[in-house]
């Protein structure tokens, strides 16, 4: 297990945190390489139940260093709260936080919110955490680097530089913008709120390269899924970073990374939160959503529910260059009477559609045999009902990539290894 990258094959919420927590038992470092406080990875283990937003899911392994890579945008107060939460549960926190990561400030969250309000019905469905504005500032060379927290004079200078550029634009575009903090006030707030983790700031490339030389096990964790990738997702209803395995090296501080394994995590049905097209959307979603507990980990918004979309998932698996698949939440399908898989799209532009072409597509379904048994206690593939085995095998055939893990519940031990 020298290098494993865990990524999403769908639109996020596939259960990556659960898979990373399972794999982290043998990892020397668990690395987040993109995103920020805009999505949550739910982890259930001996410490409790956690919805991690910025900390890597391997934080619970006492022998594992948790790394926040340079490709991230870090919300400072939220990270402090997250660290306090896991510490309170008895976790020994071992962190390395990249000095090249970008800070996601309350001003960015305000800008994000004002833009969603301005867009009205055309809004992107943002979590309003400030992710897009923070990445935008980075691209415009106005971002605030994490490393400047240890250089207060530089921090103050760069915040003033950003405000001089940003505030006239915000006040012109959003008349209701009432942000009034000075650069001095923002600097002091940042120094206060980051006190719990400033000592962990470093050039993360050095410890990671040292671990590579030792042939240590490195575990890379993506946020969201291929369908939300900035380049290959359903633009403009995407996130603002690259969520593919190809970005793991760049975003983690190891640009020359060549991972041995890429695990694409796919849910056994489709779900999506935010704006965009879910081709396989169910007509009646409420009961299934409730039983599967499908609500956004950050916003609590109900996720749109659909049947397994083999077309979108295969596209995600290919984009991720996956060597294997982890299939999650198959236990939620027990008792479903109408079980089917979308094997193709019908309509114009059915091959590699870009929005809004996706909205005109209709699914071509293949009916599957349902099962009623409770499978949460199954620990081997052969112990699953025949219909459940056939469901997994059919998805595997459609993907062209082996399904090596099947989860039948949220607990660590509820994992079937094939």
UniProtKB/Swiss-Prot annotation:
SMART domains: Adenylsucc_synt
Gene Ontology, cellular component aspect: cytoplasm
Pfam name, any one: Adenylsucc_synt
Cofactors that this protein relies on: Mg(2+)
Entry note: cofactor: Binds 1 Mg(2+) ion per subunit.
Residues annotated for substrate binding in this entry: 297-303
InterPro entries found in the cross-reference section: Adenylosuccinate_synth_dom1, Adenylosuccinate_synth_dom2, Adenylosuccinate_synth_dom3, Adenylosuccinate_synthetase, P-loop_NTPase
Record EC number: 6.3.4.4
Pathway field: Purine metabolism; AMP biosynthesis via de novo pathway; AMP from IMP: step 1/2
Reaction(s) this enzyme catalyzes, per UniProt: IMP + L-aspartate + GTP = N(6)-(1,2-dicarboxyethyl)-AMP + GDP + phosphate + 2 H(+)
Positions bound to Mg(2+): 13, 40
Binding site for IMP: 13-16, 38-41, 127, 141, 239, 301
EC top class named in words: ligase
Residues noted as binding GTP in the record, renumbered to the chain: 12-18, 40-42, 303, 329-331, 407-409
Localization per Swiss-Prot or TrEMBL: Cytoplasm
Listed PANTHER family: ADENYLOSUCCINATE SYNTHETASE
Family listed: Belongs to the adenylosuccinate synthetase family.
Protein name: Adenylosuccinate synthetase 2
Taxonomic classification: Bacteria, Pseudomonadati, Pseudomonadota, Gammaproteobacteria, Alteromonadales
């Amino acid at each position: 297990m020298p290098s494993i990258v865990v990524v999403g094959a769908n639109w996020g919420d596939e259960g990556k945190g659960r898979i990373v927590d399972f794999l982290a038992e043998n990892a020397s470092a668990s690395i987040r390489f993109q995103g920020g406080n805009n999505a949550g990875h739910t982890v259930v283990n001996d410490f409790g139940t956690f919805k991690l937003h910025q900390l890597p899911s391997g934080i619970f392994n006492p022998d594992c260093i948790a790394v926040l890579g340079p490709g991230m945008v870090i919300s400072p107060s939220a990270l402090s709260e997250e660290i306090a939460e896991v510490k309170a549960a008895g976790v020994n926190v071992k962190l390395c936080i990249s000095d090249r990561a970008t800070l996601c400030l309350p001003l960015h969250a305000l800008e994000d919110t004002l833009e969603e309000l301005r867009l009205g019905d055309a809004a992107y469905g943002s979590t309003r955490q400030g992710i897009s504005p923070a990445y935008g500032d980075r691209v415009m060379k106005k971002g605030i680097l994490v490393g400047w927290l240890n250089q207060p004079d530089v921090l103050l200078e760069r915040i003033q530089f950003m405000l001089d550029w940003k505030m006239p634009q915000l006040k012109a575009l959003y008349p209701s913008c009432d942000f009034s903090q000075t650069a001095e006030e923002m600097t002091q707030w940042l120094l206060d709120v980051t006190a719990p983790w400033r000592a962990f700031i470093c050039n993360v490339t050095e410890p990671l390269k040292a671990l590579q030389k030792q042939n240590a096990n490195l575990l890379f964790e993506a946020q969201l899924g291929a369908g939300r990738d900035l380049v290959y997702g359903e633009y403009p209803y995407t996130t603002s970073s690259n969520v593919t395995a190809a970005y793991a090296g760049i975003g983690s501080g190891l640009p020359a990374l060549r991972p041995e394994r890429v695990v694409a995590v796919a849910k056994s049905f489709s779900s999506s939160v935010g704006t965009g097209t879910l081709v396989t959307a169910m007509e009646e979603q409420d009961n299934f959503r409730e039983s599967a507990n499908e609500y956004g980990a950050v916003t609590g918004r109900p996720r749109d529910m659909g049947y397994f979309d083999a077309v979108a998932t295969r596209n995600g698996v290919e984009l991720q260059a996956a060597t294997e698949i982890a299939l999650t939440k198959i236990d939620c399908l027990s008792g479903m009477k109408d079980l089917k898989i979308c094997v193709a799209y019908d309509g114009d532009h059915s091959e590699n559609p870009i929005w809004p072409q996706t909205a005109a597509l209709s699914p071509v379904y293949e009916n599957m045999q349902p099962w009623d048994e409770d499978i949460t206690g199954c620990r081997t593939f052969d112990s699953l009902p025949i219909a459940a085995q056939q469901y997994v095998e059919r998805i595997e055939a459609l993907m062209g990539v082996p399904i090596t893990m099947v989860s039948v519940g949220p607990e660590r031990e509820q994992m079937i290894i094939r």
